[in-house]
């Protein structure tokens, strides 16, 4: 295999046994693809596909005026260029968006002509607001903050059949229901009641008999009965009654008389139940007619009206029960034929017939009125209104849309073959649904499982944005319709008709404040990726936390390979917010698909198919780990498979598909946990969630024991710098990398230079630090998509969330009681868990009623010492070390004029004392914060003079840009001349540049000429002259382009900033705070093993081994067995082996062994002990030495989930590293030097420091603010609150009898207002007595009792 630039420097020993059939797909594809579909930015007008914006426009346009004389048509749209790039948007706090311009055509028809002749056509581009753009990492910058739109998992449109699980009625009878859910529009429900009548609800309103809906659709009673029932035909001749026999229908009945065949042989005796055998005999005998007694008809229901043959009088309506009287009437009238409905109690119930009997309506109009009354209670119904309302409910494309998905699901469910069709319902659709529902009630067919992933689909960003956009357009449509009638008379243009505000507002609201538009979790690269791959069942049109039951939250068999069964939050959202599995993707309908390998006759092919949950149901799917031989045949007699959502075993020839990879079940975060297969699921859940909270450490350290997914996450997260094209590194420093692109990758007419600017010390959403460091050196060769610079939490292009710590599992002096963690001081000294946090502090100068606030260094009543870190503009220097209470930005606010005494006025007049009418409102460092100022940004309103600091910052930025552009030009020029040099070398000159004709060009000749003179050369070959001219023109164009770019940037920098109304100036100060690890910080491993640092011990006191190597961390062994996360123990053992091998390599390097010996040892490490084979032969000796140097600190290993290292392999690794195979060693107590009585498990575990730092949580209150009503101190760090002395604490003091302490707690320390002020004065005077008064709570209590109308007073003695 070919190794990338970083892989060559450090190969991970991989223990996986299964071949990689398919690479893990790009992890952010779900976001990027969806939004790309929505915008269709690159498409030309004729090539727009009917999705996204285009579809939204087409669904609303054309808009036709009420009179029908004018219409507004949609032609196409185009997206402009963004005003600022992403970084500028973040800095300025604006949205990264592009203007949307829509071309519309206004058509005015001639009123006079009969055939709508066109009178006038106007076409114009109309501005329709801004559309936010997605950055290349799948985020949006909205008002300067990075946000993510989370995908939503909602119920797919279509028709669903369900029952109430016997909960509605006390008898426990199952009441079946059907629900037609459209993409937008009214819901239609059919449901059975306990009496087995069918009812309909529209939009969950009052129920009506279902027959009302059928009548409203224009069906008569007879048609309804014909549709739902078959009929029995009786012939009457005189006193005799005979039935046209269909033998199947008699099954299960009791014979009321003997049944004979034509010869007179008795087939069924009277009183016997008719069985399947009898029916077979009847069919064989060919009995067509059956004479029955007259009573046989009684109780049956007529299928058609019975009419008097002579007079035409209706004797009985259809759907009437046959009674004795009716029979006598019929016999008298000499009716010869009666049709009755065929019903029975087993598989053909009389439900629709019964429903028709309770229905009060008798014709279509009455039915429409009944529906109108239900939808609009209290409004008087008219025929037109009722018809319009009913038509708009389900049959109007403007109000109702099933969508392509809905139609597909609908047709599949009711058994049609075609999957396309209209977006609105038809009569037939409604009847088919009712038929299916009745069939299910009759025991044919089953209800749907609503949690099946075939019935839930994913709505991604693009689709949700399109829906919002459509909502905005519909609002515009109403306004446009009204204005269109004026357009014809007043000659308006399209621009005058369309007001873009509602569209812009809808889009802004969606991106800014929708429940699914979330502030990006930017703790580390993994949390970013996970956030973008999240699928939520909450949000608009989804579930709510309170309503969601257990079933929705549970793991469903169809989640396999689509949604991760492990990664979900703990707490109220458990199971509602999920993560996509590693290989999952959505199909065109939004259903999640998982990849499988095709298996034919027991032979596994490399063809891959993606299947949704519906499509995979009938397949027999083998595990990825099923045993195969070299010919890829399944060799086990019985293979473990999944079939019909069950786990079972089948013969190899029955298998049709096979999993692609063992990690296709889990999400990205879970696939980063080594030995996941040995952890309990609950702890694995905590492990995946805690990796997302890891704070990037100062120096990232790759995990010694990983899973091989680290590289994918780091590459796809976008925090690393990835080469766009291959080439040679031209120059590299801390802030930029310049690549000279390979000739074969250069497009014609461009420079072939890629410049990558690195992000330095920037604040993330979670205040962690984003910083990139180059990995490459000048002259290195890189290929396309190699990683050239590490970002936060990445080490050589691999995700590195924590540090490898030497740990021992042992109870030690009680310091690690109950999950506490004991650390060595060495961890702090080496800055292993030191993190940098960047805080943004903002100072806003506003225009107040009393005058403008001013940012200045001239602050009243502040000593010189407090101002020594400010410049003349009153803003702190970059690089200043500041602590709590220091002034960062000096600001004064005008104070209201106070009434002055005449003496003061006189003094004012004499001394010109102005300082007293302003108050100090400077920005100070918040309490408990200490750090370094790393950056200052000043934003000034247009028209306000900029201060010296703002000008200095602007000059610095301009210099930076100029330097960048000059550098770019220098490289472009260099590259161009290099190419010319290789083309001209050895060619003959025709003259020019002071050279004689016939001179042959060599390097010396060219070095003797200045670059400008090269273009004066006339060569003998015309092609070369042309190349010279092109090169000259290219350089001139490039210079012009760069100058334009500079001017553009300069203009942007110099224009005023768009600030909120009333704001004159904003100063942002960025503080970098360094946090070392300390007691109280939360740490965790990757297996859900979390704890709090309890103590940091001196190195010399820590337990150490026989060589004197102390351990870094002591963990409690009692935390392992009950929690069943044994993965951490295996990780510890393998980590020890990895470290041991590294030390062995280090010794070999120190002894200056030859490269050949190193090669032999490395081959042994990588290829002798199981797992994937590495090809070390393609490495040169230098590369082998470089590799060995990078392995000194430990050989990194990969044990992929469900396909990892086996116990024997771990033992073999330990043996190879000359370490005990048990993974245990004898330790000595650092304090006493005594040996511990039994060997202890020692090894290396990857530990994370989580973003729950004691510095952010702990605070102390002196005197602070009080609650207005109760006068008690507030709570919480943000309010500078106190600790609540609660009910139980009061009981504790009562139990001790500590009366005075209790009195102090409940009075002067809480809400005795006078007492606490006195106390304060007393303490200041050095007098420590207290005089408790009445707590304010009593007054509150009295007021509450008075509010109940009881007058109560406290008597004072």
Curated annotation (Swiss-Prot):
It comes from the Bacteria. The keyword Transcription applies. The keyword Hydrolase does not apply. PROSITE patterns: RNA_POL_BETA (PS01166). GO terms for cellular component: DNA-directed RNA polymerase complex. It is an enzyme of class 2 (transferase). Its EC number is 2.7.7.6. CDD domains: RNA_pol_B_RPB2. Keywords: DNA-directed RNA polymerase, Nucleotidyltransferase, Transcription, Transferase. It catalyses: RNA(n) + a ribonucleoside 5'-triphosphate = RNA(n+1) + diphosphate. It holds the Pfam family RNA_pol_Rpb2_45. The RNAP catalytic core consists of 2 alpha, 1 beta, 1 beta' and 1 omega subunit. When a sigma factor is associated with the core the holoenzyme is formed, which can initiate transcription. Belongs to the RNA polymerase beta chain family. DNA-dependent RNA polymerase catalyzes the transcription of DNA into RNA using the four ribonucleoside triphosphates as substrates. PANTHER family: DNA-DIRECTED RNA POLYMERASE I SUBUNIT 2. HAMAP family: RNApol_bact_RpoB. This is DNA-directed RNA polymerase subunit beta. It comes from Pseudomonas putida (strain GB-1).
